[in-house]
Amino acid sequence: EGEILNKRKIVGLYDPEENGFDLEMWNNTEPKKIFQLSEKINNMVLSEDAKNIYTKLLLTNSYSPKDGIDEKVFLSIKSDWLIKFRDIDLIKEYLKKNIDIKKNEQLTVFVLNELFSINENKQACELLEELNTSFKDNYLTKFSIYCLIYLKKNEQASLRYDLEKELGYKEPFFEKKF
């Protein structure tokens, strides 16, 4: 009693029942074939319909395959697909629904870079605030503190920086700021 039976995470965006899929849809699939097929698909020019079908398949809530595939590789397949098509709104939605996935730092960096590059600083900072995550990535840590300052939450920014400093993070810019 109280035992966790399945330690694999459910990752995705769409309800499997709405798309005719199942949470365990990857269980009987050979992991190596998933990776090879995704590599092949990523190099193809797909019609909009094919792209939408593959997106639904990849982003439907499911467990990763049981046998032999590293969960990071499986998540990487999803991240690479999202980045390839640069749909910022879809990526943001995926990030918000899968906050606890470490591999999402790559997606978070991608979205932030895209938003900052078009001068959407407020939108980038609001996303970081909504994710409200401690990052292992120094780049994301820096921007999460910067965004608190940008959003005029200096006290929170100072507190966040102090907490990060205790974990070994150091940034000369913030040392001067606080």
Tell where the protein language model's regions lie, with residue ranges:
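Alpha-helical segment of the N-proximal tetratricopeptide repeat
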Residues: 73-87
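N-terminal alpha-helical interaction modules that lie
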Residues: 1-75
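Solenoid-like repeat scaffolds
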Residues: 20-29, 43, 58-68, 93-103, ...
